[in-house]
Amino acid sequence: MKRSLILCGVLSVLASPVAFAQADLAKAKNCMACHAVSNKVVGPAYKDVAAKYAGQKGAEDKLVAKVLKGGAGTWGSVPMPANPQVSEADARSLVKWILATK
């Protein structure tokens, strides 16, 4: 039991910098101009995106394409613009972070 608690503590400390790094990347790529983690802004909250796509096969690839190319109609009438300033690697990293949001 004691080892489990220690392991959980160590893992949470190690995971925290990754979460902060992804939030910083989202800010740097202007994602946070339209999105937030917990609240709808112009676009949906990341936790809502994670809930909608939880367990869906191909969700990661679909969302990477949406980040890069934009799209409309999934979350209402306001379209998501294409993001040419985001590399595919950064888009994939952001999508993985978004899908892990609770």
Which residues does each predicted region cover?
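Axial heme c-ligation environment in periplasmic c-type cytochrome domains
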Residues: A33, V42-Y53, K66-V95
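Alpha-helix N-cap and coil->helix boundary residues
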Residues: A21, V41, G58-K62, W75
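C-terminal alpha-helix
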Residues: W97-T101
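Sequence/structural segment immediately N-terminal to covalent heme-attachment motifs in c-type
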Residues: F20-V37
